[in-house]
Amino acid sequence: MKYEEIVADLKAGKYAPIYFLSGEESYFLDDIATRIEKNALTEDEKAFNQTILYGNDVSMTTVTDTARRFPMMSQRQVVIVKEAQNIRDFENLLPYIDHLQPTTILVFLYKNKKPDKRKGIFKKLSSSSHCIYFESAKLYDNKIPDWIISYCKDKKYMISLKAAGILAESLGNDLSKVANE
């Protein structure tokens, strides 16, 4: 699925049970995760139903146990796993995929590293109808000005192609840096 399609679904309030977001361009991964984090639950629901975990600190068993909980006074809960590339026992997610908790939105941020698609878990994630499997590649330098124009248009600003080219040239291809400017 493409970034634009995922964002359109999120804006429409359509959430998948699992999001596996990987790749070298962290801007797209962070943006999708932030949209889920900010919009899937109301402020009141977040206290009990939103959990952010870090791959360095947890095992997959902890992640799946958290995802299997039922939401409290809400329709759903959100579990976001940052630095998921550091989880060693990723294979332990397989039983959860087969028996999902339908009220949970589970988000994995697998940054700056490509998953080994030969492993069973990543094959299962990429082929599962319950999972949005998104891989973001770095944008080529010649695509950055067009991305800047599109980004500005989304934010209701106007920018010329020449100005976008100058911005791209001075800031490079780090989209997070470009978006902050």
Regions found by a protein language model. Name each.
Residues 1-181:
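Conserved beta/loop motifs at nucleotide-recognition and modification sites
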